C-alpha cells in the first residue's frame, strides 16, 4: 500500500473537520465519517485520535441514555474549534 504524503493527510483532516462542522451539533460515529470521506475506518480513527490530541475534536463515549459505548466511538467538533470555524464562516 503506498504511503500517503503529509499534505494529503492534512487535506483529509480538513475534510473530517469540515464534515463535523456541517453536521454539528450532532456527533457522528467513526464509520459514518469514514464513509463520508471515502476512507477505511482504521485510517479515519487514527486521524481522529490525532485531531483529538490537538483538541480539535472531542470523543463522545456515552449514548443519549448515558450508557458507555463498549466498542463504538462518536466524534464531534470541540467547542473551541467550532467557534473558530463559525467565525470564519461569517
Residue ranges and their predicted role:
Residues 1-17:
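Short alpha-helical segments that sit at the start of domains
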Residues 9-10, 26-27, 41:
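Alpha-helix N-cap/helix-initiation sites
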Residues 21-25:
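Short helix-capping/hinge SLiMs at alpha-helix to coil transitions
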Residues 26-36:
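Short acidic, hydrophobic short linear motifs in intrinsically disordered regions
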Residues 39-53:
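Short amphipathic alpha-helical interaction segments
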Residues 52-64:
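A short, conserved structural fragment
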Residues 61-73:
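Short, Lys/Arg-rich nucleic-acid/phosphate-binding segment
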Residues 76-90:
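Short, amphipathic alpha-helical interaction segments positioned at domain boundaries
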Amino acid at each position: 500500500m503506498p504511503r500517503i504524503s503529509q499534505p494529503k493527510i492534512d487535506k483529509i483532516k480538513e475534510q473530517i473537520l469540515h464534515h463535523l462542522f456541517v453536521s454539528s451539533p450532532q456527533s457522528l460515529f467513526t464509520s459514518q465519517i469514514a464513509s463520508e470521506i471515502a476512507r477505511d475506518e482504521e485510517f479515519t480513527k487514527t486521524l481522529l485520535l490525532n485531531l483529538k490530541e490537538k483538541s480539535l475534536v472531542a470523543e463522545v463515549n456515552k449514548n443519549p441514555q448515558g450508557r458507555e459505548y463498549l466498542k463504538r466511538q462518536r466524534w464531534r467538533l470541540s467547542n473551541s474549534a467550532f467557534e473558530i470555524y463559525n467565525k470564519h464562516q461569517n
